Design a protein with these regions (language model features):
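Active-site-proximal loop/hinge segments that shape catalytic or ion-binding/gating pockets
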Residues: 1-166
Length: 166
């Protein structure tokens, strides 16, 4: 099944990115940028979602050139970052799925920068991620909850459909 049909079949109309509200003004100005573009353009980030280890792992796998996203608005990494006090004022950015068609995009059935993780082209979404389980409120310990989507380089602010607190 092609990506458009997969999204329609599973009722996926938005995808998600969590961050701290302190980053919103920068996102409004520049869009949602990959770690690599943030560094290249020397853009100040008030609060990174990832720590130095996460950034090093991203760079090692070439994932620093991608914006990391979730299919559901309930990702375990957001919970951990809030619990550890890294993100103090969490927000979820609701993003139009059209970004998956406009830029190079991929999917992974776990955290993309995990040592055992392999990312696949977005066209393989249904084969890679158990969408039935993920979209039916899986238990917090279900590994599928760590699934990620990645979109190359930048997501324009115009593709952000909404900002949700929490």
């Amino acid at each position: 099944m092609n990506l458009k049909n997969t999204l329609k079949q599973y009722g996926i109309t938005s995808i998600w990115h969590f961050t701290d509200a302190s980053n919103l003004a920068s996102i409004e100005k520049y869009g949602l940028l990959s770690l690599d573009l943030l560094a290249q353009q020397k853009i100040h980030v008030s609060c990174y979602g990832g720590d130095e280890l996460s950034h090093r792992l991203d760079r090692g796998k070439g994932l620093d050139k991608f914006v990391h996203l979730a299919i559901i608005r309930d990702h375990p990494m957001q919970y951990i970052k809030v619990k550890n006090g890294i993100i103090k004022n969490p927000i979820w950015l609701e993003i139009d799925t059209s970004v998956l068609f406009e830029n190079e995009s991929g999917c992974c059935n776990q955290l993309a920068n995990a040592s055992s993780a392999k990312c696949y082209k977005i066209e393989h979404l249904e084969e890679v991620i158990d969408l039935n389980t993920l979209l039916n409120k899986p238990h917090w310990s279900e590994p599928v909850r760590k699934s990620q989507l990645i979109v190359a380089n930048k997501i324009d602010y115009s593709k952000i459909l909404g900002v949700h607190h929490g």
